[in-house]
């Protein structure tokens, strides 16, 4: 038995005194009971800690001896007066037993004086006295988790269970509980088993079988697994005297010893018992944790599933250590990576699979790419309702080392901050996604590791500044949403509230379908963190709501009885409540800067159009939403309005609905439909693929899914205006009906509905929309759709007949639906609408504009010229889709401008042409993925750029308007136009005045219709007053006037070229040349179609702008774009036509395809000091062109349309770059040589006989420099004369220069992004100043590139070019 004595001393950490014990003749454990305090010195035990250990050991042995006597003499009355035992403690509970005897000895006897016994629980239950002693022992020596103590729970039904307990030195650790309880010799312990529903109401989950009974991986039986990991006390905590209060009893049971004080000041220990799927003590390594938690997930993803593993817990509890680990003890990331690569190498069928990694964080509800300089990301939903992180950079890794290096790089970018508990606490949720893809980049499986931000009570925050509070609030809100999602999934609720936070939205794919989730709750053992630890354990327990610990002792009747009661807490956290209230802080945070002039949220609640306002066959769709730009605040509140995304998925920004004049509202409907149509087109095109033609018939089905509701607020408007505007719009709308059934004029619906009824319906629809959209997205937008405004100016004759071709309708509807769907699916998060993001978008819009072209154009390269034209036209339509955003932007711009109606009217003023439009062409044309679609697929930066371009240029609005007008026009045209060959032009020159003066923004839109060669051209000019004056010009000339109230720009009068042979004239290449700013006129035949759509009738007419045109445009960018420039420059450009046969062969083909439709594109440069999207949008809005019969590609002044229409702006270099990139990508585009552009003055090859030049009118001083003459030159023969080899070399030089410029612009873009991200904390004036500096740098960068472009044009342009060179 000496060996048993030695073991006992070892356990008590007294092994060094074993020789002293044997020297005194102590050979057996029971002999230790004879030792007294006087013998300690004889045994050589002088250290006080050792003496305490020895004393406790002797005390335990004496108790056990008395226990043995009690077993042998049951009738003996036990004397317990020396022990403070409450009667309540006699209840059954865990029994900790020390056993130092061999199992064989235990078989021979139930009790032994030699050591502690190991016996069955039935023996305990048979003897209450014995259990009393054990209870006392338990009170004295709570076990510590690090020693893996096992506890048997004594209950009536568990009598047969057999418990074996190991004990370790911690039981004898000095002052284990005395440190907690002070002088209390035997603390009173109350045991509380935290079973399901212990604190949060009764759970609905079913009893789960004990995990110890499971032999298979947990992923085969459960969707969610909750584990707990306890970290050891740190050295610093030990020095501070903190006590370990956590005990890991077994692999599923955890005890927390909480110090409590009764009312009578009696101190006691409250023992909390928790049950989890797996409990890891502090001795467990990351490898142990990995094998039990993540390893089964790796197997799962190789079976084609999704998996998520996330660490949760208080800051400083070991989450990051668990996930990332150290070099010596790698975390779950590294272990999973090793496992993945090992499986890829071993399994032959998996040789073709590759590993991709992405790393981003969610900080304060925003997404940032940690592998791409913290670039802002956006979470969107695709058509399959799968969440896509737009712009997320994914890196392919081929080794564990590279993967860890990538993770290390991203970890350095994480947002951290000092908290009350941890000096370097993670203040963001870090998401590492490891994806397994095949060679075609199809995702085979994906696992996400999430290192959640540290949860912490607001009261514990070290800093009380606003940012810290917002961080904490965001973290806690997202964690609450995460818990609710997991519980809803585990209990199979019908609705899972994924949209309550950005975290759950991003993790949606990890929780649905064939997805497995593992939660690792990390806890600290220190008594200082008791409350945090309990909160973490309760959170984890609530997530799983396990009942396995009580499956034997909880009666069925009691469970059923209590299950009916839901705690108020459960009800409070219901998804409905959270969506409205919990997210409100975020909503306020994001939206407070966007509209300073917006009325109180209550007053701005948007009204929705009555359902009756929509034609019967048109699906309700909503216009895309664009985040309000800063500039928007300038507009009067009355013009603010919100475009609601479709109720299905979109979001409505409550309080953003600005009041609308009824006249606008009518157009709104039709506009919405049109926009929706465009959108759908884009969608379908994406689905069908870049090369496939887009068939409107298919699209129509898509539209039907979408419901459009556009809120309109009442505004006092004369009934005359109302009826005037609405009639046209309604008529147009009815055109859009999908099935081509006779469309009844929408005007009837409007006029028949009492205003109060409309308001009620609008209010209800808007109200219900809010519940279907994340509140974060409900921000105020301060813009109104220009299309709607323009529509009211539409000549009555524009109304469509019932014959509207179904294809067109389906197209528009599809467009609409697609856009809406896409917007909704993408679920524009507040990110996308946030003020900052919009600014960023603005910054990048120029680039986007170029990219927009690329979106459409690059898809059509392989096709024949005719098809290209059609597709380009389609692209134009698609661009409206992309333009949807733009439209919003443009609309927004208009709304900002009190006079926006004028502009809107201009945009809308597309008088119907008299020729049937070639719908089939429209149907066949496919732009490939629409820019919007591309948006979803493209990296964030390009997407933002795209959006930016759209918004800024207003081009988007313009596009939308064009689309709307096109659809209207096309519908009308189809009904009314006798021949497709008639050329109808509508040119709206929109002048953008200084942002401050709405009057200056007035735009004049002149729909020019050439019904026949001799047919009078109707000109609708919109004047500042906002009234459209239809006029006929027998000569066929179109007069455009723009009046500026401020007088900044002198009236610009353009006489449109007369084309006596309207029908015969092929699309002409028209280039608008501005001294300083060259407005591009899209060449109907030559170049790729501008991203802007041409009115549907004019789709044929939509002029693909040749790359040359784009180049010209670039070269013609304003000589000095100064951010402070007051006005966007609008320069009249001569427009020339030449017969298709005289165009370069390619152009001729295009021209043929265009059916000799002429498209004039004016890109108005928006050079205003404000580079915001708002300005751009305004300008873009102004620049919209409507073409009555033949949809015109329209260009917004502020925004260059696709490449050609891009207007140089301070930020336009991006656009130019993109254009160049497009050129590079698509050599097939018309070359400069094809365009035959003169070096500086832009020369379009034209037949002089057929071309009538527009006479340049005085250009605003801002635009034209005195030194830059506008010398349009027409070289009929030089269309394609450049020398190819030399041209290619020169192109390479320009391309290199462009690449450098791209890099510089990217740098400036990043600076601008950073500036915008800091907008909340910066003074706005300072922000504007810094933004102005960035714009100046961008302008210089652009000018540098332009100098190269001018050099190129000088060297390789037509021989006559030099004399017309415009200084750059």
Swiss-Prot record:
Residues annotated for ATP binding in this entry: 313-320
Post-translational modification Phosphoserine, affected residues: 102, 112, 478, 584, 622, 646, 826, 829, 1012
Ranges of biased composition (kind: Acidic residues): 819-830
UniProt entry keywords in alphabetical sequence: ATP-binding, Cilium biogenesis/degradation, Cytoplasm, Cytoskeleton, Microtubule, Motor protein, Nucleotide-binding, Phosphoprotein
Residue ranges of the region described as Disordered: 89-112, 557-584, 602-639, 651-670, 729-753, 792-849, 864-938, 952-984, 1054-1073, 1086-1148
Annotated region (Interaction with MPHOSPH9), positions in chain: 478-709
A GO term from the CC aspect: protein-containing complex
GO molecular function: ATP binding; identical protein binding; microtubule binding; microtubule motor activity
SUPFAM superfamilies: P-loop containing nucleoside triphosphate hydrolases, SAM/Pointed domain
Keyword Phosphoprotein applies: yes
Domain of life: Eukaryota
Main location: cytoplasm
CDD domains on file: KISc_KIF2_like (cd01367), SAM_KIF24-like (cd09541)
Biased composition (Polar residues): 557-576, 839-849, 871-881, 1106-1119
The keyword Magnesium appears for this protein: no
Domain SAM residue range list: 1-64
Known partners and oligomeric status: Interacts with CCP110, CEP97, TALPID3. Interacts with MPHOSPH9.
Reported function: Microtubule-dependent motor protein that acts as a negative regulator of ciliogenesis by mediating recruitment of CCP110 to mother centriole in cycling cells, leading to restrict nucleation of cilia at centrioles. Mediates depolymerization of microtubules of centriolar origin, possibly to suppress aberrant cilia formation. Following activation by NEK2 involved in disassembly of primary cilium during G2/M phase but does not disassemble fully formed ciliary axonemes.
Family of the protein in this entry: Belongs to the TRAFAC class myosin-kinesin ATPase superfamily. Kinesin family.
Protein name according to UniProt: Kinesin-like protein KIF24
Organism for this UniProt entry: Homo sapiens
Gene name, Swiss-Prot/TrEMBL: KIF24
């Amino acid at each position: 038995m000496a060996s048993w004595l030695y073991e006992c001393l070892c356990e008590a950490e007294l092994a060094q005194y074993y020789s002293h014990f044997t020297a005194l003749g102590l050979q057996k454990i029971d002999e230790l009971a004879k030792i007294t305090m006087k013998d300690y010195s004889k045994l050589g035990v002088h250290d006080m800690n050792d003496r305490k250990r020895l004393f406790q050991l002797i005390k335990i042995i004496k108790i056990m001896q008395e226990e043995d006597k009690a077993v042998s003499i049951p009738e003996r009355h036990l004397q317990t007066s020396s022990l403070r035992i409450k009667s309540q403690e006699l209840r059954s509970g865990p029994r900790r037993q020390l056993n130092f005897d061999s199992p064989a000895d235990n078989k021979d006897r139930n009790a032994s004086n030699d050591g502690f016994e190991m016996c069955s629980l039935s023996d305990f239950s048979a003897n209450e006295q014995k259990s009393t002693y054990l209870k006392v022992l338990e009170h004295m020596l709570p076990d510590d988790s690090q020693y893996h103590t096992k506890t048997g729970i004594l209950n009536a039904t568990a009598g047969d269970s057999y418990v074996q307990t190991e004990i370790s030195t911690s039981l004898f650790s000095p002052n284990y509980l005395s440190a907690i309880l002070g002088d209390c010799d035997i603390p009173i312990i109350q045991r509380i088993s935290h079973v399901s529903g212990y604190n949060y109401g009764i759970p609905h989950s079913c009893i789960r079988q004990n995990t110890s009974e499971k032999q298979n991986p947990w992923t085969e039986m459960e969707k969610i697994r909750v584990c707990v990991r306890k970290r050891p006390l740190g050295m610093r905590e030990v020095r501070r005297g903190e006590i370990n209060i956590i005990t890991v009893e077994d692999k599923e049971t955890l005890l927390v010893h909480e110090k409590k004080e009764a009312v009578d000041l009696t101190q006691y220990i409250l023992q909390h018992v928790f049950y989890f799927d797996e409990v890891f003590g502090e001795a467990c390594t990351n490898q142990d944790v990995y094998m039990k938690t993540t390893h089964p997930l790796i197997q799962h993803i190789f079976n084609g599933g999704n998996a998520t593993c996330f660490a949760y817990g208080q800051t400083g509890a070991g989450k990051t250590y668990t996930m990332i680990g150290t070099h010596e003890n790698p975390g779950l990331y590294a272990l999973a990576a090793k496992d993945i690569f090992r499986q890829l190498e071993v399994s032959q069928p998996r040789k073709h699979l590759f590993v991709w990694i992405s790393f981003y964080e969610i900080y304060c509800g925003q997404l940032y790419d940690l592998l791409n300089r913290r670039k802002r990301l956006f979470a969107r939903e695709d058509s399959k309702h799968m969440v896509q992180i737009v712009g997320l950079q994914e890196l392919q890794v081929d080794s564990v080392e590279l993967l860890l290096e990538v993770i290390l790089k991203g970890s350095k970018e994480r947002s951290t901050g000092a908290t009350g508990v941890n000096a370097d606490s993670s203040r963001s949720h870090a998401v590492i996604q490891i994806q397994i893809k095949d060679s075609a980049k199809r995702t085979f499986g994906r696992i996400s590791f999430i290192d959640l931000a540290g949860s912490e009570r607001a009261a514990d925050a070290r800093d009380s500044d606003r940012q810290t509070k917002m961080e904490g609030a965001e973290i806690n809100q997202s964690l609450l949403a995460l818990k609710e999602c997991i519980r809803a999934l585990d209990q199979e609720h019908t609705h899972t509230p994924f949209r309550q936070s950005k975290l759950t939205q991003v993790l949606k794919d990890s929780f649905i379908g064939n997805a497995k989730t593992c939660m690792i709750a990390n806890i600290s053992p220190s008594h200082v963190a008791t409350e945090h630890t309990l909160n973490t354990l309760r959170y984890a327990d609530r997530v799983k709501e396990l009942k396995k610990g009580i499956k034997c002792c909880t009666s069925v009747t009691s469970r059923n009885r209590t299950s009916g009661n839901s705690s108020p807490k459960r009800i409070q956290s219901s998804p409905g409540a959270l969506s409205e209230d919990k997210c409100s802080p975020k909503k306020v945070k994001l939206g407070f800067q966007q509209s300073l002039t917006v009325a109180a949220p209550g007053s701005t609640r948007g009204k929705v159009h009555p359902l009756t306002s929509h034609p019967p066959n048109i699906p309700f769709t909503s216009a895309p939403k664009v985040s309000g730009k800063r500039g928007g605040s300038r507009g009067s509140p009355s013009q603010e309005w919100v475009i609601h995304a479709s109720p299905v998925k979109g979001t409505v920004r409550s309080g953003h609905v600005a009041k609308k004049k009824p006249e606008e509202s009518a157009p709104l409907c039709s506009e919405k439909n049109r926009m929706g149509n465009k959108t759908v087109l884009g969608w379908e095109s994406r689905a069908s693929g870049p090369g496939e033609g887009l068939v409107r018939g298919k699209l129509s089905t898509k539209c039907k899914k979408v419901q459009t509701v556009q809120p309109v607020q009442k505004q006092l408007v004369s009934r005359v205006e109302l009826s005037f505007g609405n009639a046209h719009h309604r008529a147009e709308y009815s055109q859009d009906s999908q099935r081509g059934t006779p469309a009844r004029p929408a005007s009837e619906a409007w006029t028949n509905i009492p205003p109060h009824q409309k308001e009620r319906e609008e209010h209800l629809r808007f109200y219900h929309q809010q519940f279907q959209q994340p509140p974060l997205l409900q921000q105020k937008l301060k813009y109104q759709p220009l299309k709607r405004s323009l529509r009211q100016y539409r000549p009555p004759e524009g109304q469509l007949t019932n014959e509207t071709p179904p294809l067109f309708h389906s197209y528009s509807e599809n467009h609409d639906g697609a856009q809406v769907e896409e917007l909704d699916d993408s679920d524009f998060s507040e990110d996308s609408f946030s003020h900052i993001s919009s600014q960023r978008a603005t910054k990048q819009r120029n680039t986007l504009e170029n990219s927009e072209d690329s979106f459409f154009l690059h898809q059509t390269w392989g096709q024949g010229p005719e098809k290209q034209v059609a597709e380009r036209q389609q692209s134009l339509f698609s661009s409206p889709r992309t333009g949807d955003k733009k439209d919003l932007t443009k609309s927004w711009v208009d709304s900002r401008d009190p006079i926006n109606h004028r502009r809107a009217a201009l945009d809308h003023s597309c008088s119907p042409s008299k020729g049937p439009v070639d719908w089939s062409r429209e149907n066949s044309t496919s732009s490939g993925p629409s820019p919007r679609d591309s948006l979803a697929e493209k990296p964030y930066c390009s997407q933002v750029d795209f959006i930016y371009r759209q918004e800024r240029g207003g081009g988007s609005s313009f596009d939308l308007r064009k689309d709307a007008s096109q659809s209207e026009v096309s519908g009308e045209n189809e009904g009314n136009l006798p021949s497709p060959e008639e050329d109808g032009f509508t040119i709206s020159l929109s002048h953008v005045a200084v942002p401050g003066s709405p009057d200056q923004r007035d735009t004049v839109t002149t729909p020019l219709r050439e019904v026949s060669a001799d047919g009078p051209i109707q000109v609708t000019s919109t004047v500042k007053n906002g009234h459209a004056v239809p006029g006929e010009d027998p000569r066929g000339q179109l007069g455009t006037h723009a009046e500026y109230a401020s007088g900044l720009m002198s009236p610009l009068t353009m006489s449109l070229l007369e084309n006596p042979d309207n029908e015969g004239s092929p699309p002409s290449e028209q280039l608008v040349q501005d001294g300083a700013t060259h407005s591009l006129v899209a060449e109907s035949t030559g170049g790729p179609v501008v991203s802007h759509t041409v009115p549907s009738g004019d789709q044929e007419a939509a002029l693909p702008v040749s790359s040359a045109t784009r180049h010209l445009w670039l070269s013609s960018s304003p000589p000095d774009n100064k951010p402070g420039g007051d006005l966007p420059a609008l320069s009249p450009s001569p427009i020339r036509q030449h017969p298709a046969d005289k165009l370069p062969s390619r152009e001729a083909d295009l021209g043929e395809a265009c059916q000799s439709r002429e498209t004039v594109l004016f890109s108005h440069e928006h050079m205003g000091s404000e580079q915001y999207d708002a300005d751009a949008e305004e300008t873009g809005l102004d620049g919209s062109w409507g073409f009555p019969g033949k949809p015109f590609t329209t260009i917004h002044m502020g925004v260059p349309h696709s490449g050609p229409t891009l207007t140089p702006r301070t930020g336009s270099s991006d656009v130019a770059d993109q254009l160049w990139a497009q050129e590079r990508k698509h050599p097939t585009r018309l070359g400069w040589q094809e365009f035959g552009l003169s070096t500086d003055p832009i020369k379009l090859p034209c037949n002089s006989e057929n071309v009538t030049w527009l006479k340049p009118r005085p250009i605003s001083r801002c635009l034209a420099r005195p030194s830059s003459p506008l010398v349009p030159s027409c070289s009929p023969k030089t269309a394609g004369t450049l020398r190819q080899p030399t041209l290619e070399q020169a192109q390479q030089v320009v391309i290199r220069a462009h690449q450098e410029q791209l890099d510089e612009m990217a740098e400036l873009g990043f600076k601008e992004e950073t500036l915008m991200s800091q907008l909340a904390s910066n003074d706005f004036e300072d922000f504007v100043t810094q933004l102005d500096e960035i714009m100046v740098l961008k302008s210089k960068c652009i000018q540098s590139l332009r100098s190269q472009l001018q050099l190129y044009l000088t060297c390789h342009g037509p021989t006559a070019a030099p004399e017309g060179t415009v200084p750059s």
